[in-house]
Amino acid sequence: MSSPTSPTSSPGRHHWSNSKDGMPPEYTNQDPNSDQADNENSDAKAHQPQHSPQHSTENQGHTGTSDTSSLEMELSKLHPESKQRQLPHSPEHERSRSPIASVVSYRSHMTLEDENQIFNAEMAVRGSQSLQRRPTGRSVRGSMRRLSSHRSKSMRTSKSKKSGDYERTAENEEAAQEAENHLDNFGVVTFGTEAPIKAPDHPVTIFGRIFKFIQQRSFYLRSLIYIIPLGVLLLIPVFIGRFYHPQPPYRDELGHEYERHLHVGGVDLMWMAIWWEIIWLSIWAARYAAKVIPYFFAFFVSFISNNVTKWRCMAVALEFPITLFLWMLAVYVSFLPIMTRRHIGDYGVPDHVRVKLPWQQSANNVLITLFITSIMNLVEKVLMQLIAMSLHRREYESRILYNKFAINELARLYGYARQRSFDFKDAIHRAQADVFKFADHQHGKKRAAAARVAQNALNKTTYKAISAFNFATDMVNKVAGEITNREVEKSSSPKSVVLHLLKTTRGCQSLARCLFEALVNPENPDLVLDDFIPVYTDETGEVDNATLEACYSIFDRDLNGDITCEEIELACVEIGKERKSISASLRDLNDSISKLDGICMFIVAVITLFIFLYLIARNFSGVLTSAGTTLLGLSWLFSGSAQELLSSIIFVFVKHPYDVGDRVDVMINGTVTSAMVKEISIMSTEFRLLTGKVIQAPNSLLNTLWILNMRRSDGIADPVTVNLKFGTTLQQIEQLRIKIIDFLKEEKRDYKPDLLTEVTDLPDLYSMSLCVVFFHKYNFQDEVLRMRRRNMFMCALMTYMQELDIVSPIFNSPGKSKDSPMYVNFNNGSMEGVKLSGGNDGGGTENHRDSTVGGGILKNPKAYPYREPTPPGSSDSDTASVSKKRVDFSLGTRHLMPAFDDVADIGSKRLGRDSLPDAVIENAGTEAMRREAEERRRAEEEEYERSQQESSSNEENENASRTSGARFSFSSKASRLSARPSARTVPPLQHISIQDLREPNENNTSKSARL
């Protein structure tokens, strides 16, 4: 909702000076710019929404009104009067203001909807979402928005779907948390190549419920639940083989007795069962080892790398491949020693002969194949992680660093604003407590008193449990942060509120207006750098200038020195969109890498098959020849698909010309198509056209096209070509340039103060094509802003051309103007009474021919922009002297030549970590990045100190040379020759100073005489 603007204010600027008696506008939901605002002011005051969980109805009676009034009183007592600039208390203002609006700053740009958005975010981060999902637990903001009847009906009729909505909301929260982890752990991309086994959302059978219950437990408890039952079952054959002997002992020829053992495939049953037990326990031992390996790996990597977190996260992502490798290693190593050393003879007696039975040889070949497969799988996963990390570092590291820094600074500013203007902590607790006083109404019917009391008690218990859980979570995070030396955000921290507000465009605008309201000076309509100093001043009074300037540059993109409320809104919206774009890009990148991983796994499976055939086949060469012949014969079938796949892989992972959310211009068949990147996959890309249509294009085709990425572009030049009348004077063109440049300087927030004009063509001496090139300060990523800026320029251009009487070439046609009359030739003779404009002597025709055809534009007095028309009676010499004055035929482009030198842009790199300020890296970077920034700053400081010392020593030497030079002088001949280099050695006591060389010869002579 826009704020009222004064008639003298520029468009898009927030002013409140048009209100009566210099007072700010009243807080209503009406648009201040609408014509009906004054007429409906009284109705808006009468229907002002209150802070209550439901609208007042006749069924609620006097209780709801009293509770709402008490809630308003509680909300109005949040801050002392010394910390706020409240509006004057009057009955009219009291009726028009909400309880939260009463504590808003004096020059408020915030509306009631903005306050609702912030209050909504504060409620959400404090764990009240579970109460909001319940019909009786609606928050205070529900009534403030006056829900429509359709929404109220849908909420009443959806009670049977609450459980399903809860599950979907939980899934969305998990997805949001995963995206948050992707943004936090930059430098590492974890892709889900091994999806965990998930239980159904709504299990029907008892076994499904049990499995879901087990899957929801922690890993260690879940592993014990799985290990113990099956491990105990596998111990049964071990005890049977050890203690149970159904047959009598065997006696050999010498009379020795041997116990007969049960055997399976010639191997003792006990040892066979032990090997089965090893198979089961080794998989969990490998899983536990994979959990511990990242910490040991990080310890050893810390000796050679500073970025330990990245490699530890990589080892965590490789948990499943490492588990598979260790498991197959244990199974393969334990198979042959157990099977060959525990052989049972023909009579069931161990013969202690190491014999490899045929089935054991075949099983060993299978285990070898699986072990090699696990090795190839681990190597393939490591390569995929390295590719993902390299692509992530190249494309997203700088964007994530800058976005995290911007969010951290927004959180700092919001924390300052919350302490300064409106702290909702007490209001939220009271509001949540008052919410429980209202009973739920189902289809307009009241529940029984006992049910209402029970429901209120349940809600209170739930609220207390949530508060206790949040408190316990904050305490655990605090202890964990002290142990790990890391700062952990609280559940109700300003950053959590900022992240919640950045999810929607409306929340971004509310956050921006809140920050502007808290920082702006009452005497200045805009923000300046000094307004941010209280936020970045520590307890000792020192100001963090580096972080302050970096934060100020987030909002002051045009570098004009001040920040308007609109600029903060655009910056916050851009930060929110950038965060969503990065999350979507990382998600699509993970999907693409997962598909590439699937392709590589198919290749690994083919290699595994050939290895297995090599181990079991007697004639492997024949099998390989047959397979090669078949593959060659079917090459025509999948050759095109293989080529398309290779082109797509190169396009996505090597070229990577765009990311999700980028606006691109693709040239297809000579036609430029503008679209927004919606989704990127390994084989195709989905675009959303500006018309709303969604199209899909294969990456193999896009690999051969020209693609213009608007987001990666800087300020863009926008040419406009206009056709003017032939004979348009240079004075008119110069005046047009001056007016347009003044317009660009006035609108310096959107345009650069540079203008290029070029006469491109003079077709048939009938018209003149003038190309006007102006420069935007931003790119064309936002189509709405591009249209707005171009419309402003086009309207200004049209207005100035109309003021200067610059017309279309159609006015050169006969009869269109007085300068180009239309002559009519009658075959029957001339018309009587018609007199030519040149007179009877025909001199007028000759003069007209001389002034237009013979003289041309250079002899036309109007063509000279810097001279007055030649007065009558002046001599030809005066006219010739005036005609010798220079005319700027470059149309103002001469002074712009050095400014548009494109040589410096050739070979320049994109925005990387080196181009980011140190404050951004220290605030949002990893520990390794912070150390690099500190080392770089330390090196710069040492270099600066060294240069200062050298400069001071040079000054001392120069002063010494001047002092010694005053005692010695040379003759005029020597002074003239002293400027040339000499091969002779200078005496040690003679010093030549520049001051001596610049003195006149007579001074040198007098000095030498005195010496």
From Swiss-Prot:
Mutagenesis / variant outcome for changing residue 562 to A: Viability decreases in a calcium-dependent manner
Impact reported for residue 567 to A: Viability decreases in a calcium-dependent manner
Comp. bias regions, Basic residues: 143-161
Modified residues (Phosphoserine): 98
Region named Disordered: 1-101, 124-177, 834-882, 917-1011
Keywords, sorted A to Z: Calcium, Calcium channel, Calcium transport, Endoplasmic reticulum, Ion channel, Ion transport, Membrane, Phosphoprotein, Stress response, Transmembrane, Transmembrane helix, Transport
Cytoplasmic side, ranges: 1-223, 309-319, 388-595, 655-1011
Membrane topology category: Multi-pass membrane protein
Gene Ontology cellular-component annotations: endoplasmic reticulum; endoplasmic reticulum membrane; membrane; perinuclear endoplasmic reticulum
InterPro entries: EF_hand_dom, LSM_dom_sf, MscS-like_plants/fungi, MscS_beta-dom_sf, MscS_channel_2nd
Result after altering residue 578 to A: Viability decreases in a calcium-dependent manner
Effect of residue 569 to A: Viability decreases in a calcium-dependent manner
Recorded GO MF terms: calcium channel activity; calcium ion binding; stretch-activated, monoatomic cation-selective, calcium channel activity
Intracellular or extracellular location(s): Endoplasmic reticulum membrane
Extent of Low complexity compositional bias: 1-11
Transmembrane segments: 224-244, 288-308, 320-340, 367-387, 596-616, 634-654
Lumenal-side positions: 245-287, 341-366, 617-633
Family statement drawn from the similarity comment of this UniProt entry: Belongs to the MscS (TC 1.A.23) family.
Domain notes: EF-hand domain is involved in the detection of calcium concentration.
The protein's role, per its UniProt record: Regulates intracellular calcium levels and cell volume for survival in response to hypo-osmotic shock. Acts as a mechanosensitive calcium channel in response to membrane stretch. The conductance is about 0.25 nanosiemens. Involved in maintaining vacuole integrity and protecting the nuclear envelope upon hypo-osmotic shock.
Name of the molecule in the record: Mechanosensitive ion channel protein Msy1
Protein source organism: Schizosaccharomyces pombe (strain 972 / ATCC 24843)
